Amino acid sequence: MRTLAIDIETYSSVSLQKCGVYAYAQSPDFEILLFGYAWDDGPVEVIDLARGESLPEELQNALYDPEILKTAFNASFERTCLSAFMGRVTPPEQWSCTAVMARELGLPGSLEAVGEVIGLPEDKQKSKTGRALIRYFSIPCKPTKTNGNRTRNLPEHDPDRWAI
């Protein structure tokens, strides 16, 4: 069986922490910004949906193929968001959650902490820079004179940051 590892970055004006993943993904302004994936143990590829790229048909089909195991850290989030994005439920029995696996082994609950505990090299761990970028582009911002009174940071507002 092939494995498709998935990591998405998203935006919604609804607070994930306050309202949960279903309300977050059902918000009218919800979108998937980046779709990162790797087949089996292959290299990671990233699709920049925020910049107009689209999911290849192979990936769209893979999301529903029972012969392909989909994995993610906190798979419920990826599955729910992808279901909203695709307009069709992705079958939960086709997913494996690496966060659950980590907890079963007595490891911490955050991806960052798991990477540290198992001794992943820094370039393979969730980076603090990456976390700051996710917050910048994925969470609504307060309107200020400096930012032109916008409530959201888009890639075109800071192309250099987006390129990281």
Where do the language-model regions lie?
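Active-site-proximal helix-loop-helix substrate-binding element of RNase H-like nuclease domains
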Residues: F30-I32, G36-Y37, D41-I164
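Entry/capping segment at the start of metal-dependent catalytic domains
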Residues: M1-F30
